[in-house]
Structure formats: C-alpha cells, structure tokens
Amino acid sequence: MHGSGHSLTGAPHQIPPPRTQGAATGGQQLSATANQFVDKIDPFHNKRGTSRRLRINNSSRYNVDSAQELVQLALIKDTAANEQPALVIEKLVQCQHVFDFYDPVAQLKCKEIKRAALNELIDHITSTKGAIVETIYPAVIKMVAKNIFRVLPPSENCEFDPEEDEPTLEVSWPHLQLVYELFLRFLESPDFQASIGKKYIDQRFVLKLLDLFDSEDPRERDFLKTVLHRIYGKFLGLRAFIRKHINNMFLRFVYETDSFNGVGELLEILGSIINGFALPLKQEHKVFLVKVLLPLHKPKCLSLYHAQLAYCVVQFIEKDSSLTPQVFEALLKFWPRTCSSKEVMFLGEVEEILDIIEPEQFKKIIDPLFRQLAKCVSSPHFQVAERALYFWNNEYILSLIEDTSSLVMPIMFPALYRISKEHWNQTIVALVYNVLKTFMEMNGKLFDELTSTYKGERLREKQREKDRDAFWKKMEALELNPPAEGKEVTPSLFPEKLTDYLKKDGPNMTPLPVATAGGGDKSPSVVKKSSTGSETTTPAKK
C-alpha cells in the first residue's frame, strides 16, 4: 500500500512516566530528580515490542478507500446489448476500490458486491462474443493495476526458510484471485487485440508485474507466471525488455540479495522461451546461459528451483550441442564442496545432460567429468556415492562409456577398487562390484592390466610407507645418539634402502652434517636445491 487511506481511532495515546527501576537503572530505585537521566541511560526503555503483524496492519500497502460505499448495479445479462459496454466499464470502475482484509468484519457488504461484480465480469468476457471492445481496455488495465500493484511487505520471519516454513499468504486473496483470473481471461480472449493493448500494457506495467514475483504467496506467483507468459507471447515489442529485466533480477539475486521468491516461476517462463529460440542461437542467448543461468547454481536455496533450472540448461544443449563443454566447466566450477544434498542435485542434472549429449561432445568432457564422478563415488556420504553409481544403470550413458572405455576405465578404476575394499556402506560396495563387473565385461584385457597396475602401485605405496617410518626412526636414533665430535653423517651411515629412499623421494636432497656436541641444534637438516640453483635448509622432522 502506498500511504494510508484510514486513520486509527480510539483514545489519545498517553505517554507513560519514565521508568525508575528495572534494566535501565541496573535494578536500583531512582529518585525523582534522577528520572530525567533515564532516557540517557537507556533511550529505548519506553519502546514496547510490536508484533510484525501489527506493524504490517498499520502501514497500509494499498490505497484503501474505507469511505466509499459500493452500490449494487444491474446484471450485465439483463441489460440491452448496446448498453452493456457502459455497464461493464461502470463495474470495472467499481472494482478499482480496494478493501482492508486485515479487518475481517469491515465493509462486508461492499466486499461482497465487488466479489460478485468480478465473477460477473469474468463470465461475461469468457462467454460473450465481442465483449472486449476498445473502450474497456483502459478500464480493465487500470482496475488490474489498482488491485495487484502494491508494496510487498517484509517477511514476518527474518529467518524464513522456504523449505521448512509455511509462506505468508496474501489476506486479500479472495478479491486478488478474481482480479488475476479476469486479467488472464482478458488476455486469452480471441477478441483481445495486442495493437490496442500495447497502449496500456507497456514497459512500466511489465516492470511492476515482475516486481510482484517476490510475493511469498505461491498462488499469486503461479498466476503471475501465466499472465507474464501471455504478455510475452502477445506483445513482440516487449520480449527483449522482459528477458533483459529477468536477467537483471537473477543477477541481483545471485550476487547481491541471495533472496527472491519467484526464481522458479521465472525459470519456468524462460524454459518455454528457450524452447522457442530460433537456430542458430544468437550470441545474446549464449551469453545469457553462461553469465546468468549457470551462476544460478551458486545460491544455497538451489533446491527451490533446481528442476526448472536444469530444464533450461538441457534446452540450451538440445538447441546447440557445442555449448556442452562450457556447461560442464561451469557445473564443475560451482560444484558444492560441503553440501551433500546440493551434490546429489548436481549429479541428477549431469545425468539429464548426458541423456541428450552427442558422442562427439561426450569425448570432450570425459576427463573432467569422470574425475568428478570418481570423487563422488568415493564420498563417505552414501547418497552422493549411490547417486553417482546409478549412472551405470542408464543404458545410453553405459553405451557412451563402452565406446570410450579405454579413456573412462583408467580414471574410475582406482577409486572403485579402493571403495570395494574400504567403504563403510554395504549397499555402496554392492553397487561398486556391479560397476567393476560391467567394466570387466566391456574390456577384460584392460581390466586385468588396471588391476595388476593398481595392486603393484599399492605394494609400492606400502613399501614407501615402511621406508618412511624406518627413515624417521633412524633420524630419532641419530638425535638421541649423535656421532662423535667432528664426525660427519654420510650416506654410508644409512641403510641401503634409506639411501634409495632419499634418492627416490628427493633427488636434489643431500644430508647435512649433524652439529657437534659442543653446541648448536643437534637436529639434522637437509638441503634442497631449487630449480633456480639456490639452496634452502629445512630442519628434519623430530
């Protein structure tokens, strides 16, 4: 509401006397002469908590006209045909009056007259051929604007979680629903002429309409979605403006506010718009995908609109398969690191894309894609691992993997083999065995080679660990029993395997002499030669 059309009535507000005890005074009783200082001690001591509902109630969001009394007009169907347009306009003017629904018993008769008039207008526009004449266009648009355009209230719950909390519903919905229904029937009528409507439905009107998508009421957002889609379809001159402003709203949501209620509904509209893009795609549309759509994967409330977002991304790839590498690059960039539920959503979207990907594009993304999948199947969170392993249940994806098994198997095998021995969840272990069995059937020779290589690498890794432990034990022994004064630590003091370990792990590292017993740090150090030829000294681990 813009301002208030009514005033509060009742007894004049009495200012209470200053508090002389309580939190403002540290619990001490104050003398009368000290009262004047209470405000300075606690300037908010007189402020009483006011509920959010009361504050919204008092600060009107509509231009409510409580003084206007509506009069019951004649029925349109009982009026002569030549008099009907004038009566329709009169009823539309009558419906411009907005009532206060926060007071459920106020102006009940007028509210009922308006409700009946709206229902009658809906029936008239829907069932009467030629009902929409040029003279009623401004009256319809003005009535709609008066009813729906308003300042949306702040959320009653500052910690509102759309996934957990119930949304705040619009109290004036009994009238608002009928206004939206009337406007929708008006736009969808075969008698509607866009050439006349564009005089009244302009950029300013659309801008206000888009702002309403932040409404918490899902019923209103659903109507707005349909209305905006009809406007986009009928007014060609507004299409670029609508797309541009939606872009701006998304960018503000991602990079500034992180809060907007209508993302899902706007993405539904965009999904339909993208589906109608002509080929080849314009550069403007490709930029929209990369700069606007894909960053929508970042916000933490992704689950509220992920299905619609994934649909839009898939639509783009179906239109132009060459966009596939860019899409996967962005998905991997925004891949969640600490939120398992988001990771499951990302995996679902990847599978949707792989369902429609072309083999040539698949080959371009094998390395980054399957390295990420290897991380996912290794996840200790069983839902993430399970969702990644379900890719091997998809016949089309399986055929793509089979055609490129020589590239996929070396990436996936180490993770799968390790999980089959170590994962805590037996369901995951069973799924991994199925995948390994599939790999063995695809390319048995490569499978045997990978198995042998992996086992050999594991043995070498265990040996390196043993050598490392022995090395540090020798270091500790040298520290406890330093060599005689003047005697240097040479490689001959080390077992042959430890010398090999030094050469293997750091070919540029050579032992330094241990400090003499006469002073200095007795801990041995090593010198490491850098690529530039300079040397740095690093104390050995104790």
Curated annotation (Swiss-Prot):
* Family matches, as Pfam families: B56 (PF01603)
Tell me which Gene Ontology terms the entry assigns under biological process.
dauer larval development; determination of adult lifespan; negative regulation of insulin receptor signaling pathway; P granule assembly; regulation of lipid storage; response to heat; signal transduction
Q: Which domain of life is it from?
A: Eukaryota
| Any GO molecular function | protein phosphatase activator activity
Q: Which ranges are annotated Polar residues under compositional bias?
A: 528-542
Keywords recorded for this protein, A-Z: Cytoplasm
Q: Which cellular components does GO assign to this protein?
A: cytosol; nucleus; protein phosphatase type 2A complex
Residues covered by region (Disordered): 1-28, 500-542
Disruption outcome: Mutants have small gonads and the number of progeny is reduced. At higher temperatures, 20 percent of mutants are sterile with no gametes. Mutant embryos display several defects in P granule partitioning during the first cell divisions. Unlike in wild-type, plg-1-positive granules becomes unstable during mitosis resulting in their disassembly and in the loss of asymmetric segregation of plg-1 between somatic and germline blastomeres. plg-1-positive granules reform during interphase but are fewer and smaller.
Q: Where does the record say this protein resides?
A: Cytoplasm
Q: Tissue range of expression?
A: Expressed in pharynx, vulva and spermatheca.
First-listed, main subcellular location of the protein, grouped into a coarse class: cytoplasm
The family this protein is said to belong to: Belongs to the phosphatase 2A regulatory subunit B56 family.
> What's this protein's function?
Probable regulatory subunit of serine/threonine-protein phosphatase let-92 which negatively regulates the insulin receptor signaling cascade composed of daf-2, age-1, akt-1, akt-2 and sgk-1 by promoting the dephosphorylation of akt-1 on 'Thr-350'. Negatively regulates several functions controlled by the insulin pathway including dauer formation, lifespan, fat storage and stress resistance. Plays a role in the asymmetric segregation of the P granule components during embryonic cell divisions but does not play an essential role in specifying germ cell fate.
Assembly and partners are described as: Part of a complex consisting of a common heterodimeric core enzyme, composed of catalytic subunit let-92 and constant regulatory subunit paa-1, that associates with a variety of regulatory subunits which confer distinct properties to the holoenzyme. Interacts with akt-1 but not akt-2. Interacts with sgk-1. Interacts with P granule components meg-1, meg-3 and meg-4.
What is this protein called in UniProt?
A: Serine/threonine-protein phosphatase 2A regulatory subunit pptr-1
Q: What is the originating organism of this protein? A: Caenorhabditis elegans
